[in-house]
Every structure is written in C-alpha cells, then in structure tokens.
Amino acid sequence: TASSPTLAAAQKLFDQIKVENCPGRTKKVAIFGLASDSTAKATTDALDTLRETHDDWYFLIPAGATDTIITALSTWASATVLTLAQLESGMVESEKLLIAQTKTKSLITTAMKANKQTVICYNHDADNTSIPAAWVGRVAPNYPTSVTWKWKELFGIPVTDEKGTDREDLLEGRYNMYIERHGREYMSEGICTDGDFIDTVIGRWQIKQTMRKRLVNELVDTENIGYDDDGFAAIAGVVIAALDDAVDNGIIMKQNGKGCYNVVIPKRADATDEQARNRVIPPIEWEATVRGGVHGVKVTGTLTVALVTANE
C-alpha cells in the first residue's frame, strides 16, 4: 500500500540519487514479504528457507520490524560468519549485513554488542523514517570501491532530535544517527554493534569472496597443480591477486605505490604427512592493513586448499 513501510524504504533507497554527490542508483533490490504478525523465529526460519534458493544478496534491511525481531535478526546475521570448523565441514559462507533502525535507546544490549554483522540506526521518528534504506542507497553504488559510511548526506531523512549528552551517549552506545553539526547534515560513525566499522566489515567480505572466486577459477582452468613448491606458489598467487584487487578498490592501504600486505607462502617441506596424504596445502597466512576512512586496522586470514598431486 501507499503507506507501507516497505514502499517507504524502497522509495528512500532509490531517492538518494537526488543527493548531489551520490555516485549512482542502486541497480538491484529484492523484497521478501512476511505476514505482519510473524514471530521472530518465523522470520529467521523464513530467511533460512529463502537462502536455500536465493542466497546472492548481502544487505538485510527490515522494514517495520519490532525490536524483538531486530534482536533475532542480529543473532541470525551474526551466525552467517562461519567458523573455521564450519568451513572445513563443507558449509558455504554467505555473509549478510543487517542494517535496522529503532526509536528505542536500550536496544543495543551487551549481548548485541557481541554480535557481528549488525548495524543499528536510531531516530526518534523511526516509525516514519527509513534511514537504513536511504543509507544503503547512498553508499552501495560506490562498490566495489570502498568508502567510509560516515559523513554521508541523505535525502529525505530528518536529523535526530537528540542533543548534547543524550546524543553522545547514543553514539558511544554504537547507535548510528543522522545528525546536524555546523550547518551540515550527515550520518554518524558508520559502526557495527561489535565496534567494527561498516566499511571494514564489507571490505573483509569482498576480499574473502574475491579470493574464493579466483581460487575456483585457478583450479578449474588449470589441468593440474602439483603438490610441490611450484604448486603452492601458484595458489599463493591467487591470494596475492585478490589482495591486489583489494588495494585497487581502496580496501587495503597503499604506501609508496605498493599494497600494505604480507603473504607467507609455505613450502612442500612444511606439509605434514597427513596434509600430503589428503593433498591439503599447509595454511597460506596473509596479513593486510585496511585503509579505512578518516575515522589502521589489520585483517588476517588463512587459505587452506586441497590439491591433486603432480603424479596423478
């Protein structure tokens, strides 16, 4: 209907093209509807079912969700970041980033601060505003180039009416708000409930996805990668190429024309008997310095790959 939160959110998402320095319009959006009286469990169960057939999305923007449902969605989104044990068991990772809004100043609890992949926006008129949709509509068209989520002017969003210490308390509590200072309106910190910045979270995901895609392409397009020093170096080249992509996209810092990252390439002699028997490369360790915005953060990772031996 014309007054539905879903329609209002969609309109705010696409309206950001009206902001002078918006880089473009969001090109693809999907709307997933549930009954207005759905419980928190029914909502997360429905998302699990959706992912079985449609898992090629990243931002989760609930329209008209209650605080109870937002809390459940936070736990659900946090669980989309898999542990090493889950990955080694064969589970496929597809992270989701929850960006929700509330008018409740006590929504971000200690428990929610332990959750990953959660961004909470506060506005006194949250029932009639769509900050998450507007914010995504303003920033997402920049990608794959990384940008800070702070300082973004939004179209059609009222500034918070919180002032002084009340506003500072909310900011310190990891709420994001549309604020006004020195005659300019803009979004505040761009921070997740666990203290990570949004651009850092998305940048890590971009690196992981690029690395995985490049790895699959390398394995499919190469007739045989030997279980030897040359084979290990070829796989390490995938890591380096993915990190170079991240440098080009402004995710990883560049100094003196080079990306600020380090990759440790294992040798065949480093492999244990069990790793060799199972054709699994010893972990390729890498470390990179995230560029971030004017607000260094280091990210690390491990790539483990199973190869076919050279003589098979």
Annotate each predicted stretch with a short phrase.
Residues 1-312:
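Surface-exposed assembly/interface segments
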